Amino acid sequence: MYKFSYFTEEDKAKVIAFMQEYSFAVITGFGEQYPVATHIPLEIEIKENKIFLSGHIMKNTDHHKAFLKNENVLVIFNGPHCYVSASWYSGRGIASTWNYMTVHAKGKISFTQR
């Protein structure tokens, strides 16, 4: 993901609202040899000015085992996206692009015994 300052949302409330609206996210981690990922609906909660995500991951799967060994995760929330053709620009030498909205949240995963 390209991180240009003019595309970065600094308003924490807007970022949280985005995460809540597009809460079907991808949790990524690293297994024995390869990255692992799981798509999961998440609940977003704020406690003492910290963001907590909660959801359900089935036990004894490759991603559950990977997350037990390495608690560091990246959670990706994807929103609207669309192709932008170079022909839409008036200037020359402009390449086509893809506009999108996303949040990448880094943190640590923990499990309850429920």
What residue spans do the PLM features occupy?
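Binding-site signature for planar aromatic cofactors or substrates
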Residues: 1-114
